[in-house]
């Protein structure tokens, strides 16, 4: 098991280690408090400058080394991290979104562990969460949909056969489709095998950035709208019965909050708290 940076961290200081931090979708105020603290204390910051806005670096110390990694290979990035930590420096590796999704965390973690470099992972808000918040939409609407699938369509990197988009779409869950704008015709065809053509979906571009745009269109228009807006990257698709459910007054609600349901923290017939004074 890789050593955690916190296992060797002196009080009130960052130890020489790598801190892999999720920056969130783009808005500087959507990074976690822990992530912001690590950024403000690090000796070195390696950030994906093609996906992370420079505003997120506002609190980085002036003397800290800042390295954009958009033009670097994974091997070069790992070499930099290992070199700086062995030079007794603390390193923040700043990723867009959440490190657990499409971030090369697996490869970086293995390489750091092999080099006996301690590292810590700090989660971030993902684009699907930020998009749902902008849409004021819950993706798990009672009696409508209770599962969320995060996936992508096969492109340069193939997905396993069991995870082909058509197979996942058969569940008709809330499906969050990443990294697929360049293959949108194929994606739409696979989705139409299982979802209604007139079901509203959301096309989300540069979620969390100042130029964020979100369009809601019928599924049958997903590819056409993508081409009209010339979207080829930083695009997320939300395909979910929940989007339509939020525009309907069908009475769907959670059993947990019904007055007739009691549990450990809310006995039945619990009175509503009164306003103080």
Annotated model-derived regions:
Residues 1-122, 235:
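Class I S-adenosyl-L-methionine
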Residues 2-3, 7, 16-18, 76, ...:
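A contiguous loop/helix-start segment that scaffolds small-molecule binding in enzyme catalytic cores
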Residues 10-11, 36, 58, 83, ...:
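Short secondary-structure boundary/capping segments
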Residues 31-33, 130-133, 187-188:
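Short hydrophobic alpha-helical segments that form membrane-spanning helices or hydrophobic packing faces
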Residues 34-38, 60-63, 108-111, 137, ...:
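Short, solvent-exposed amphipathic alpha-helical segments in soluble enzyme
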Residues 53-54, 74-75, 126-130, 147-150, ...:
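Short gly/pro/ser/thr-enriched loop/turn and capping motifs at secondary-structure boundaries
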Residues 98-171, 215-216:
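Class I SAM-dependent methyltransferase SAM-binding "motif I" and its flanking Rossmann-like core
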């Amino acid at each position: 098991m890789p050593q955690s940076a916190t296992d060797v961290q002196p009080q009130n200081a960052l130890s020489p280690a790598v801190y892999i931090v999720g920056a969130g979708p783009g808005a500087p105020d959507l990074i976690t408090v822990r992530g912001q603290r690590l950024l403000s204390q690090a000796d070195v910051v390696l950030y994906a400058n093609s996906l992370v806005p420079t505003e997120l670096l506002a609190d980085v110390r002036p003397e800290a080394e800042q390295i954009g990694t958009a033009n670097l290979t994974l091997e070069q990035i790992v070499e930099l991290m290992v070199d700086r930590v062995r030079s007794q420096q603390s390193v923040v590796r700043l990723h867009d979104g959440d490190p657990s999704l499409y971030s090369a965390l697996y490869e970086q973690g293995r390489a750091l562990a092999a080099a006996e470099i301690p590292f810590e992972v700090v989660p971030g808000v993902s684009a699907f969460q930020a998009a749902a918040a902008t849409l004021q939409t819950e993706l798990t609407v009672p009696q409508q949909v209770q599962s969320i699938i995060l996936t992508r369509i096969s492109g340069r990197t193939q997905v396993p056969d069991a995870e082909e988009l058509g197979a996942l779409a058969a569940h008709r869950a809330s499906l969050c489709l990443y990294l697929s704008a360049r293959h949108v015709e194929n994606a739409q065809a696979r989705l139409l095998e299982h979802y209604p053509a007139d079901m509203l979906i959301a096309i989300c571009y540069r979620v969390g950035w100042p130029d964020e745009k979100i369009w809601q269109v019928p599924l049958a228009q997903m590819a056409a709208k993508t081409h009209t807006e010339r979207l080829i990257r930083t695009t997320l698709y939300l395909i979910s019965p929940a989007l339509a459910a939020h525009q309907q007054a069908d009475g769907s609600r959670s059993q947990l909050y019904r007055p007739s349901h009691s549990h450990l923290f809310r006995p039945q017939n619990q009175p509503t708290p009164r306003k103080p004074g």
